[in-house]
């Protein structure tokens, strides 16, 4: 079995976050817990995860700015 250092965060049903996930090279993985499988966002490197966080912050910032537009 190969031991990978995968960074995982909770799955969110948000199409913009899902799009950014794939943009940075992330993916959805399923983890087994007892008798159920749970989806998680997974990244192979800390750089991919940091890029994801940065793009999510930009997305949130842009949404706040656009909500104040008249």
UniProtKB/Swiss-Prot annotation:
<protein>
    <recommendedName>
        <fullName>SPbeta prophage-derived uncharacterized protein YotJ</fullName>
    </recommendedName>
</protein>
């Amino acid at each position: 079995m190969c031991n990978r250092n995968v960074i995982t965060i909770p799955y969110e049903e948000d199409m913009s976050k899902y799009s950014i996930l794939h943009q940075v090279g992330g993916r959805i993985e399923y983890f087994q817990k007892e008798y159920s499988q749970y989806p998680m966002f997974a990244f192979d490197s800390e750089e991919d995860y940091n890029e994801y966080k940065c793009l999510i912050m930009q997305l949130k910032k842009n949404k706040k700015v656009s909500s104040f537009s008249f």
